[in-house]
UniProtKB/Swiss-Prot annotation:
It catalyses: UMP + diphosphate = 5-phospho-alpha-D-ribose 1-diphosphate + uracil. The gene is upp. This is Uracil phosphoribosyltransferase. The keyword Plastid does not apply. InterPro entries: PRibTrfase_dom, PRTase-like, Upp_B, UPRTase/APRTase, Ura_phspho_trans. SUPFAM superfamilies: PRTase-like. Keywords: Allosteric enzyme, Glycosyltransferase, GTP-binding, Magnesium, Nucleotide-binding, Transferase. Allosterically activated by GTP. It comes from Actinobacillus pleuropneumoniae serotype 5b (strain L20). The keyword Hydrolase does not apply.
Amino acid sequence: MKIVEVKHPLVKHKLGLMRAADINTKDFRALATEVGSLLTYEATTDLETEAIEIDGWCGKVEVERIKGKKVTVVPILRAGLGMMDGVLEHIPSARISVVGIYRNEETLEPVPYFTKLANDVEERLAIIVDPMLATGGSMIATIDLLKKAGCKQIKVLVLVAAPEGIKALEAAHPDVELYTASIDSHLNEHGYIVPGLGDAGDKIFGTK
């Protein structure tokens, strides 16, 4: 599995701000979008382009455009919504596919409750966004759903990832690509990433 830890200074700086215990909802939400945007830039460097001719200000000019059906953004509800706009800043015409999965806090197992995928999801690059890759259960379940729908190319964008989650994801889906702002130390006994960001969903939605 391709694993990319994006070490750009802007990513490090913004993620460092997000780790503060006293960060407010407004700032956390804005930074989640910004880091999501920077991760998107890294994850789309291999998009295929094609040359086309258009009318420029001084006549015909050859330019490059993204080729064919492009992207569907797949936020995992609810926290993934906090990163979605960062992707759409670069790919505003992307289709949105929504997957609702929550983690049972006792068993730590994923529980799916909602799925609405783009009609042509099998023809698109799926970019899954979720702030945390902890145990990997929710991400694996989401990829299972996408592959069952015929999706062949999948990339995962997360703010922070635990080694345990990376290992589980690689074992289940070695063909996907993972882009993260940080590979953190470990999971604690409650299944939270250390040092992590705390509960990203609560911080994005102001329910902490």
